[in-house]
Amino acid sequence: MNVTLTKAELADLLFERVGLNKREAKDMVEGFFEEIRTALERGDSVKLSGFGNFQLRDKPQRPGRNPKTGEEIPITARRVVTFHASQKLKAAVEQLSDASKQP
């Protein structure tokens, strides 16, 4: 059962569970992700205790290949965002995975 949780659904959960009105819930979710984006744009890491870390990583230029022609082409250097799940999150996901495998 793969379901995707969206920002709109997060806002609905805040509305239902916390008691914010729908506008406040939507603004809170948007603001949360905006703060993460802004921090990453500044080059800062984002550490969410019990969840994980978002970090920037510079990837150097490397050789690549056009799969159609086989021609070698350079893949330019770039900066990417990486996410590393916390041990707590990994353990929770693993526990769910183990439970779903039980008959």
Swiss-Prot record:
CDD domains: IHF_A. Pfam families: Bac_DNA_binding. It comes from the Bacteria. Keywords: DNA recombination, DNA-binding, Transcription, Transcription regulation, Translation regulation. PROSITE patterns: HISTONE_LIKE (PS00045). One of its GO terms (cellular component) is cytosol. GO terms for molecular function: DNA binding; structural constituent of chromatin. InterPro entries: Hist_DNA-bd, Histone-like_DNA-bd_CS, IHF-like_DNA-bd_dom_sf, IHF_alpha. One of its GO terms (biological process) is regulation of translation. This protein is one of the two subunits of integration host factor, a specific DNA-binding protein that functions in genetic recombination as well as in transcriptional and translational control. Heterodimer of an alpha and a beta chain. Belongs to the bacterial histone-like protein family. This is Integration host factor subunit alpha. It comes from Azoarcus sp. (strain BH72).
